[in-house]
C-alpha cells in the first residue's frame, strides 16, 4: 500500500505529537514552521521540536514500546520552514497552529495556491468551526477538522468533523489513513466543541465547582474520577452506561438534582423522557438508547465485568493508589 507523505504545519506539542503518531507507523513526515521568525528564533524552535521528538522516542524505548531505534523513527520526521520547496505534493496536510481564527485563516489562504485538488487538509482545532475556516480555501470541500487528544501519539481517538459540503471521499480517505496508524476515528457534524471537548468542559467545570463549594479536596475529587467514573468509562461508553444502569436511574437522578440545584444542566433530556414514556429503559426491556433484541443480557454484563477486572489488575500492579 502506498505511503502518503504527511505534512504538519505547526511544530508545537500537538504538531510534534501528530508527527510522532505517523512516524511510529513508518510514514515520512514534514513538520513545517511557517511563522515569521528570525533565523536564530527558527533554529531555536527547530531544535526544541527535535528534542521533543527525541526525548519521547527515548522514553518509549525505555518502557519497551518501541520496536525500532529512536534514531530510525526520528529520521522519518523532517523539520523545515520553507513552504516553496514542498508545493504539498503529499496527500494530507494537518494544520496545528495556535487556536486563533485569524491565524488559521491566514495560513489557509497562504497555502491554498500550493494545494492539489485532491489534497486533504485537516485543522486540529478543538473550538473553531468549519464554516469559519473554509473561507480560507479555494477548494473547501477537502477541508476537515481532525480533533486529536493529547498526547496525540498515544490516545486512539480522533474526531473528524465535516459539513454537508465536505467531500465524502475526503472523509473516507482520512478515516482509512487514521486507521492505518492505529487510531479510532469517529465522524460527526460540525458542531461547537465536537464530542469530547463539549462533554469534557462540563465535567471539568463541575469538578471545579465541587472544589469551590468545599465539597471535597482536589485530591479526593481526582481520586473519585480516576477510580470511579473514569475507570468505568474505559469499558462503558456514556450512553451505553445509561442503558446498562437503566434510563430510569438517570431520569430520577436528574429530577432530584434539578430540584436540589434549580439548574437547567440537570434537567431531564427530552430523549430520556420519551424513552421512559415508551418503557425503553435498557437491556432489561430489550431497548434503551441501543437495541438489545436478540442479545443475551447476562453475557453482555459478564463481558463488561471481565474487562473491568482486567483493568483492576493493571491498577493493582501499579502499587498503592493514594
Annotate the PLM regions:
Residues 1-56:
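NAD(P)+-binding Rossmann beta1-loop-alpha1 motif at the extreme N-terminus of oxidoreductases
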Residues 2-4, 183, 189-190, 213, ...:
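NAD(P)-dependent Rossmann-like dehydrogenase/reductase catalytic/cofactor-binding core
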Residues 30, 183-184, 197-200, 204:
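Structural/interface elements that position substrates and couple domains in central-metabolism enzymes
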Residues 34-67, 162-167, 194-200:
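Rossmann-like dinucleotide-binding cores of NAD(P)H-dependent redox enzymes
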Residues 37-44, 59-120, 128-129:
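Rossmann-like NAD(P)-binding element
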Residues 122-190, 194-197:
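Rossmann-fold dinucleotide-binding core
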Amino acid at each position: 500500500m502506498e505511503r502518503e507523505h504527511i505534512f504538519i504545519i505547526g511544530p508545537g506539542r500537538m504538531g510534534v505529537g501528530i508527527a510522532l503518531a505517523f512516524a511510529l507507523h513508518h510514514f515520512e513526515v514534514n513538520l513545517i514552521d511557517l511563522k515569521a521568525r528570525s533565523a536564530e528564533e527558527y533554529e531555536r524552535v527547530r531544535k526544541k521540536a527535535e528534542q521533543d521528538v527525541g526525548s519521547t522516542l527515548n522514553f518509549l524505548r525505555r518502557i519497551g514500546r518501541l520496536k525500532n531505534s529512536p534514531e530510525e523513527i526520528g529520521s522519518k520526521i523532517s523539520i523545515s520552514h520553507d513552504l516553496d520547496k514542498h508545493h504539498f505534493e503529499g496527500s494530507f496536510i494537518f494544520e496545528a497552529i495556535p487556536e486563533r481564527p485569524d491565524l488559521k485563516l491566514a495560513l489557509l489562504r497562504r497555502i491554498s495556491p500550493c494545494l492539489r485538488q485532491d489534497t486533504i487538509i485537516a485543522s486540529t482545532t478543538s473550538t473553531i468551526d468549519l464554516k469559519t475556516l473554509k473561507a480560507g480555501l479555494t477548494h473547501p470541500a477537502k477541508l476537515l477538522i481532525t480533533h486529536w487528544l493529547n498526547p496525540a501519539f498515544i490516545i486512539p481517538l480522533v474526531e473528524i468533523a465535516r459539513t454537508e459540503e465536505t467531500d465524502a471521499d475526503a472523509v473516507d480517505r482520512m478515516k482509512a489513513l487514521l486507521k492505518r496508524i492505529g487510531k479510532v476515528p469517529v465522524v460527526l457534524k460540525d458542531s461547537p466543541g465536537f464530542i469530547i471537548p463539549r462533554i469534557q468542559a462540563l465535567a471539568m467545570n463541575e469538578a471545579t465547582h465541587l472544589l469551590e463549594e468545599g465539597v471535597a479536596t482536589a485530591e479526593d475529587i481526582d481520586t473519585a474520577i480516576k477510580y470511579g467514573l473514569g475507570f468505568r468509562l474505559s469499558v462503558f461508553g456514556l450512553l451505553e452506561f445509561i442503558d446498562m444502569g437503566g434510563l430510569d436511574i438517570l431520569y430520577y437522578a436528574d429530577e432530584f438534582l434539578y430540584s436540589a440545584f434549580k439548574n437547567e444542566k440537570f434537567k431531564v433530556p427530552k430523549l430520556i423522557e420519551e424513552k421512559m414514556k415508551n418503557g425503553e429503559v435498557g437491556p432489561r426491556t430489550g431497548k434503551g438508547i441501543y437495541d438489545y433484541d436478540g442479545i443475551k443480557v447476562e453475557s453482555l454484563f459478564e463481558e463488561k465485568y471481565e474487562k473491568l477486572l482486567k483493568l483492576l489488575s493493571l491498577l493493582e500492579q501499579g502499587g498503592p493508589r493514594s
